[in-house]
Amino acid sequence: MTEPILALSHICREFMTGDTKVAALADVTLDIDRGELVAIIGSSGSGKSTLLNILGCLDHATSGSYRVAGEDVAALDADALAALRREHFGFIFQRYHLLSELPALENVEIPAVYAGDTASERQARAERLLARLGMAERRGHRPNQLSGGQQQRVSIARALMNGAEVVLADEPTGALDRRSGEEVLKILVELHREGKTIIIVTHDPEVAKRANRVIELRDGLVVSDKRTDAAVATAAASLPADKPDTRSSRWSGLAFRFRETLRMALLSMAAHRLRSFLTMLGIIIGIAAVSSVVALGNASQNKVLSDISNLGTNTIEVFPGKDFGDARAGKIKTLVLDDARALDRQTFIAGVTPTVSTSTTVRYRDRESNVLVNGVDRSYFQVKGTKIAAGALFDAVAVRNIERQAVIDDNTRRTFFSDDQNAGIGRVIWVGKVPCRVVGVIAQQQGGFGSNQNLSVYLPYTTVQAQFTGDRSLRSVLLRVSDEVSTDLAQEAVTTLLTRRHSTKDFVILNTDDIRRTITSTTQTLAFLVAAIAVISLVVGGIGVMNIMLVSVSERIGEIGVRMAVGARREDILQQFLVEATLISSLGGIAGILIAVALGALLNLLLPGFQVSYSTFSIGAAFLTSTAIGIFFGYFPARRAASFDPVVALSRE
């Protein structure tokens, strides 16, 4: 005696309704042999659909034993049950359960996707099945473009896609007119003749007459099990080979399933464009904000540091006075040329320039304007990093001989001469009451501290002391520290030296590195604060992704049930919704990055001296962040989708 393909022994299935336990099946024992055409009949609530769900491994029994081809179903985990449904069963539903986003051909292919078949093999087999069922010309139509009978034919083709041994049909004619229902029954009878095991759940006695075995249920009990005179079909060998002879490798199967998952995610997004865009919007704003804040912070910092460099690179400057803002600083005359010479002899000093200054007027022909007169040494321009635009700088001889040679800045040139850079070279201007010959023009310095619209004239400091101030004391001593020496250590040494020379600390030191560090710290703090706000926006966007995905899961529970019924593993469902959430976040991240880059380019056009740039690292980090948000916030909805039992998901369609 051959082993039955399906064997149920003392099966019970109980449900809780409030505090009451209801038995849908009570002590059902059945054996179903290969090649049988079985009809399960009964009134509504008799337990026939529950029995069909247990037979198809969509539901589990409360007690009892169920074996499929000799294998105990109770010993199988969720993935093994999915494999059993995928390889042994085909389902035909009363409401068809076709996926609305897919055309008929791709609906038929779904079981083979989860089986890991190649795309070409899937398509060829699906086309053969549709052609066999008279649906070849409508393979590209979506479910809403098909009649009920046509949709049920597609459902039958899907049930046969993986070469199912057992076809389970739940009220297959219940939603069809008589003609369409008759066509579906003829197809099922034909499949039975070819060797398939067909189990039909119906309440229609006329449908049950087509079966060679009729099982009647009442209140969860088998009250009748009759066989007709019709012979059991055993001609399985004559059935065309719908099931593939070979499968792709495990890794290829994973790749195919992932590609299908990605395609389904894109289809779902396309079907709900506005919802997808609104979901992305939080991510777009967050990524654009974070990327822009980082880039703007770096640009601001670079701009400020560039402005600080205009004060001199690696420099410290000594001023008279007990402290900054000392009201008596102007009366302190102890900072003199000998101090500058003493500092110049120190090994850690790369350059020294004494400075004196005063304000006066400059006249050239009929033009007159107030200027700042700076008395400096030739090395001043090197220490400050100043570039010459035209002419030359005065030399050491001019300083020693107290010559009246002037170097003017670009503002002074434009005020008194034409826009030609060389226009003022060799001209004599009156600085106060002193005639001075212009020998050079320095290039305009962008930014800096204070207004860059001031007019400045640079003369040898000896000339300013002799011709203008009549004072031997200095306004300041500007020092350039050797590159290998810390400015902090140099500041301590200068303080020690001058305190010893003056017998008191009657000077203050401006360290440009201190300014640089302070401003850098400040800009970083501000950037951090703004970035924190942007990160909050990202988190809000991530929560939005999670909320929308939870809504999507609720709307697509029926789809989840269908996919599980045709063999999708829990990890396949998890992957599908996780990929969708990740895709939404990643596309939002890309859009946010593009907006940030466009904003940076616009700022660069509007503010030439302010250069916003985006590094490959920052762009990559922004993209990875958006992807991580999709994975993190999409995991919970995806896990919820994967946690449904197939029978529960199908019942909520």
From Swiss-Prot:
EC numbers on record: 7.6.2.-
Residue ranges annotated for the ABC transporter domain, each copy included: 6-244
Molecular functions (GO terms): ATP binding; ATP hydrolysis activity; transmembrane transporter activity
EC supergroup of this enzyme: translocase
Membrane spanning stretches: 277-297, 526-546, 587-607, 617-637
Superkingdom assignment: Bacteria
Primary location group: membrane
Positions contributing to ATP binding: G42, S43, S44, G45, S46, G47, K48, S49
Compartment(s): Cell inner membrane
Any one cellular-component term (Gene Ontology): plasma membrane
Entry membrane topology: Multi-pass membrane protein
The keyword Cell inner membrane is assigned to this record: yes
GO biological process, one term: response to antibiotic
Keywords annotated in UniProt: Antibiotic resistance, ATP-binding, Cell inner membrane, Cell membrane, Membrane, Nucleotide-binding, Translocase, Transmembrane, Transmembrane helix, Transport
Main function: Non-canonical ABC transporter that contains transmembrane domains (TMD), which form a pore in the inner membrane, and an ATP-binding domain (NBD), which is responsible for energy generation. Confers resistance against macrolides.
Family: Belongs to the ABC transporter superfamily. Macrolide exporter (TC 3.A.1.122) family.
Subunit record text: Homodimer.
This protein's name: Macrolide export ATP-binding/permease protein MacB
Organism: Bradyrhizobium diazoefficiens (strain JCM 10833 / BCRC 13528 / IAM 13628 / NBRC 14792 / USDA 110)
